[in-house]
Amino acid sequence: MSNLMEVIKSRRSTRAFKSELPPKDQIMQIVEAAEWAPSGMGKYLWHFTVIYNAEKSLKLARAVAEADNRGPQYNFYGAPVNIIISYKRDEHHALVDGAAAMENLLLMATELGLVSCWINQLRETCDVPEVRALLTEYGVPEDHIVVCSAAIGYIEKETPAKPRHEGLVSITE
């Protein structure tokens, strides 16, 4: 087993991916890690939708770009895989549960030698009719909202670590 702190410190948000698809078994390991995240009150009302097809991912990115006025160049950074975390609509813990699952997902991708980028635009556009139609076609349940998604793949261009801020911790004894 790897050193967890090393994995945490080496994780980056990558915005330049190679077009090569990672092995499907690695993607399923990533999803399994997400499934093991904690969930408020043990509800586990999330759903993971894997878009293991660069063309379909690009089609969704184009719909998001149109809905969010991002321009024609928006493409989920060219990642060949996109994993969507959705949650039952109107559930109190959806955002924090989804965030916990996403962190597990991102760390497992790093552990497996893949890179990732957390993407929020689907949360903001999931109910735009053109976007919702694709989400439904790809397997996101109708009664779910998108919490977040992750672009997954191999790195095209190295991403240096950003400096961390100081003074963000208070300890009371």
Predicted region positions:
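Acidic, surface-exposed loops and disordered segments
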Residues: 1-173
